[in-house]
Amino acid sequence: MLGIFTSFRIFILFFSLTLSLISCTREPEIKKPNAITVGSLADAKRLLPLLASDSASAEISGLIFNGLTKYDKNIKTIGDLAESWDISPDGLQIIFHLRKNVLWHDGAEFTADDVLFTYNTVIDPKIPTPYSSNFGPIDKVEVLDKHTIKVSYKEPYAPALESWGMGILPKHFLQYKDITNEYYVRNPIGTGPYKLKEWVTGQKIVLDAFNSYFEGRPKIDRYIVRVIPDTATMFLELKFGGIDFMGLTPPQYKLQAGTNFFNKYFHKFRYPSFGYTYLGYNLKDTKFSDKRVRQAITHAINKKDIITGVMLGYGTPCTGPFPPESWAYNPDVKDIEYNPEISRKLFREAGWVKGQRGLLEKDGRAFEFTVLVNQGNEARMKTAQILKENLKTIGITMNIKVLEWQAMLHEFIDKKRFEAIIMGWALSRDPDIFDIWHSSKTKEGEFNFISYRNDEVDTLLLEGRRTFDFEKRKKIYQRIHEIFADEQPCTFLYVPDALPVLHKRFKGVEKAPIGIWHDFIHWQVPKNKIEWYN
């Protein structure tokens, strides 16, 4: 996300990056050849799908649990725990035919009762889940037999199939339990390809392959997540064999991962991420309640300098809530022009004028705020510095506060104890953004933590869910894109490229529209490689 750059600052940035380059010619020391170790900036918080609101928790719980549906490599919805389904002509009923002989990690059998239990849990108002609205349009869920379940909707619901991609919970293990209790969020039992072996808080999470997985035992024996809170240390761990996979920063990808050594031992990938980075405002704060102020801030930010100076070209400017890869993206919405003069004019119209110290003031109060950034995210921290300088030129003081990710998420964002934040959204392929932007989703733990409210957007978000007509949905979401371009509920900064890197001993890896992890259970390390490393 973020700001501006003078040519001098660009030089300083690149000079500091160059000094940080570390040569490496020694082969990575692989201690567990048939395990994959993944680097993560943050620890998971809760390994239950209903409660997994952060990316670390969601990614790991995705290996432990299955939904009824999932995406294939071409982003087509296919069956997961559901073998097939029938949809009524009016779209108001779905009958799911569930797979047989599916076992939970403790050996119990998966049945339709688990699906009903999951539904009843997610709609329970006492459960602090951000996903309840995905099941709000449901009238009832009925168990027809052990492996058949019927879902009836009150009205058409376009993301219905996708919504059932949420992980199903084990009734026999969680019924009558408080699923928010630390024991249950840290000791999950799923049906997925991997089961939890060990969780050392702040250090690592270890998953073992599930021998009785219904699609066949994964070929990689163990999946390990190591918590490494900064990308520089993580990159060193990658080069010396401490981890096998990480998402590179743009400087790492461009300046450090192009050596013969690196190309010999690692696969590099590059593709547009399906999400964006933004500067978010607490819209309950009176400083940000006037859209002219938000427009003015956006006009003061030079996104191209961020793309060049922070992302090194590995990204594109963001114009709204849908990335260019989305069918909901509106190509007619142009990016807001970087123009400090327009910014100053808008601030004057909103009542903010320069005082004696050269700072913007209103009613004797200077325009000053603090932006929160998560520790270890190099791109966001550098973006914050650029934003600070951009806004300084028009008379705004922006302070930067760096926080550990889980503390930032649960102590500040969930509780709305912030003025502004630099964050990112990784989006679903269906453009239903109800959970992020609808005014009903502002409670603690939900995703509209900036407290955005717009009656037209609320109506459009509901309409987008209620029609199966593709062209109608497209027009609805493109209209939302237009509204956001005017309202600037946040400053949409950039769409970063995903820059993952993986050790070359893993075979069967296929880059696809959905990324590289779609077929992970079939990745393997050839036997001769395992023997060689051992």
Positions of the model-derived regions?
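Detector for C-terminal structural segments
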Residues: 200, 277, 300-334, 379-388, ...
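Structural transition elements
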Residues: 282, 289, 317-355, 375-382
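Surface-exposed binding/hinge segments that line
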Residues: 86, 97, 132-174
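Aromatic- and charge-enriched surface segment that lines or borders ligand/interaction sites
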Residues: 83-128, 150, 234-237, 287
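A structural "hinge/loop" feature
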Residues: 42-58, 81-82, 108, 130, ...
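Ligand-site clamp/hinge motif
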Residues: 182-185, 210-256, 388, 397-399, ...
